[in-house]
Amino acid sequence: MLVRDRAELRAALVALDRAASSHPPAAAQDAGPARAASRHDRPVRAVVMTMGALHEGHASLLRAARARADQVVATIFVNPLQFGAGEDLDRYPRTLAADLAVCAREGVDVVFAPAVIHDPPPLVRFGAGPLGAVLEGASRPGHFDGMLTLVGTMLHLVQPDLAFFGRKDAQQLVCIRRMVADLAFDVTVIGVETAREPDGLARSSRNVYLTAEQRTEALALSRALAAGAAASADGAPAVLAAARAVLDAADGVDVDYLELAGPEDLGPVRGGPALLLVAARVGTTRLIDNVSLILPTDTQGA
């Protein structure tokens, strides 16, 4: 079911709950704690938030939601609040008909695809604080504030029990989890592993911008991460050196950052779980990727 504004969304969600009241919910039988936390004992509702141009990565999020919830809501909205000056807001791919086909294939109950969310733009916004000032935030000031404002609004409108986000956008996931914890949102945030092409390239809606040659060059990102992960037993300096060697040898890759960070707060790591994150431009397209790894506990982080 496609809905285009807040009133239609409210009506669709009410209709879902009414329909469920006369039929035993299927997924709730094994939903565990999520079912117990479900509002007013209604069926478990999940949301997957997207900007459209859906690909297999989004489909994996929808499948994960479908497996855990009785009701699945997908949102499709290109959020202007998270685009800065000179970024690709105007040319970001918009493929609603194809997106609806993906949602139908994956069993989505409601697709919320509004033309606008905030009109006029909100005076009061969520802020990512220090989490939004590093890594992506250093290159894209205000990006995470705009993202959190939209995510917070969607959580309020959809009222989900579960919210699914991809681990490829690691900093986004960290910020969302912190917002949910700090502001007491009644929702469980679930990260889903990065979907990759057979050759290792992380799936992204922006991959459509790449020429055939640039797509080959972009493989340096995932190869660098793999090299870094393979060196993790030797400590943080070895991880960064191995990954940097791959990037330095690559043609057509302009690296923005390559860093190790803590998976909970993006701070320096001294050992244990860590994220190795990379951002680079290939041609005019900015790509990000990351990998989780474990550092020796006696090794000082970078």
UniProtKB/Swiss-Prot annotation:
Q: What keywords appear on the UniProt entry?
A: ATP-binding, Cytoplasm, Ligase, Nucleotide-binding, Pantothenate biosynthesis
Positions with a binding annotation for (R)-pantoate? Q82, Q172
The GO annotation for biological process reads: pantothenate biosynthetic process
Q: Where is coiled-coil annotated?
A: none
Annotated Gene3D superfamilies? HUPs, Pantoate-beta-alanine ligase, C-terminal domain
Binding of ATP occurs at 51-58, 166-169, 195, 203-206
Q: In which pathway does it act?
A: Cofactor biosynthesis; (R)-pantothenate biosynthesis; (R)-pantothenate from (R)-pantoate and beta-alanine: step 1/1
Catalytic residues in the record: H58
Q: Which GO terms describe its cellular component?
A: cytosol
Q: Where in the cell is it found?
A: Cytoplasm
EC number(s) per UniProt? 6.3.2.1
This protein's assembly is summarised as: Homodimer.
Function of the protein: Catalyzes the condensation of pantoate with beta-alanine in an ATP-dependent reaction via a pantoyl-adenylate intermediate.
Q: Which family does it belong to?
A: Belongs to the pantothenate synthetase family.
Could you share any additional remarks the record makes about this protein?
The reaction proceeds by a bi uni uni bi ping pong mechanism.
Protein name stated in the entry: Pantothenate synthetase 4
> Which organism is this entry from?
Frankia alni (strain DSM 45986 / CECT 9034 / ACN14a)
Tell me what gene encodes this: panC4
